[in-house]
Amino acid sequence: MTQSTNFDDVYPVQWRDDQVILIDQTRLPLEYKEVAIADYEAMGHAIKSMVVRGAPAIGVAAAYGMYLGARRIQTTELREFVVQLEFVADQLRQTRPTAVNLFWAIDQMLNVAYHSGENVEQIKANLLSQAQQIQLDDLRTCQAIGAAGLEVLPREPHQLTILTHCNAGALATAGYGTAIGVIRAAWSAGRLARVYADETRPRLQGAKLTVWECVQAGIPVTLITDNMAAHCMQQQRIDAVVVGADRIARNGDIANKIGTYGLAVLAKMHAIPFFVAAPLSTVDFALDDGSQIPIEERDPVEIYQPEGNRITPEGAEFYNPAFDVTPASLITAIITEQGAIAPEKLADLQA
């Protein structure tokens, strides 16, 4: 049975009792289970196996993973400490290739190691503080994204039906959520009638996680299979689409969970606004466009053997990309903590 959990208390990554506590998202919604992580190897496995997932949450988890790795380093010599910490960073970078927040957070932690503290113990303390700050900043960022999203949602009808894909909620961030943050803000303002949640094959994050979050929050939610979205749009059941992003190129192309591109095409066809909600830390200004975003391919067992039950005969081949790229031309606006931005204006924000 699902443990009763208040939405406001859903924090997928926490620092508690000198270790990291993760909500095991592979067990939701049937079981609410927390997992204690005490070393960077365990954190790397948790990220790769999707115990923790969602680009911002992965970034927070990686930051704590860096501290866990630093804590275990025995040397007191600064140069050797940095060398060993860079090894930890390399191991964590290999866990998930698409979500840029992971790389951003690791770089933030390395920057602390390079430029703060006069001794190793001081650097270790600074690394823990930095990880905690990354977590706090992301929570505040998500709240700001929610407020910014509320401002750009369609004015009519007053109560909207919003379609979302995968899970860009509290479970995918430090808390509150990006796309679900916008939905939550709309619900609090009396502007939301209902959420339609794609199940999101093959991992079913929509069915398992987004629906779970909405139920916890008391938000009306309707689950649909991915191939029902076009019909729902044609029947005028959808007023707006709001999704998250795992990486955004400087031209406004975005990589998000597989199936997002198809939704954007459908939304364009039906003249439905398509919004992407993500923090600026998800923008990779080093990439000119979405063709340069690395796309993770996962074990095909996720396709042919969902929930441990094989559904496809032997002899077939499989293709299991975890993400696809949505061109900027299909996106109405990218909702960030600094407000909603037209995709073509994103490069103007580069520091």
UniProtKB/Swiss-Prot annotation:
Pathway as given in its UniProt record: Amino-acid biosynthesis; L-methionine biosynthesis via salvage pathway; L-methionine from S-methyl-5-thio-alpha-D-ribose 1-phosphate: step 1/6
Enzyme Commission (EC) number: 5.3.1.23
UniProt site (Transition state stabilizer): C166
Catalysed conversion reaction: 5-(methylsulfanyl)-alpha-D-ribose 1-phosphate = 5-(methylsulfanyl)-D-ribulose 1-phosphate
Binding site for substrate: R53, G54, A55, R96, Q205, N256, K257
GO MF, one annotated term: S-methyl-5-thioribose-1-phosphate isomerase activity
Active-site annotation: D246
Keyword annotations: Amino-acid biosynthesis, Isomerase, Methionine biosynthesis
Superkingdom, natural source: Bacteria
UniProt keyword annotation of Cytoplasm present: no
Purpose: Catalyzes the interconversion of methylthioribose-1-phosphate (MTR-1-P) into methylthioribulose-1-phosphate (MTRu-1-P).
Protein name from the UniProt record: Methylthioribose-1-phosphate isomerase
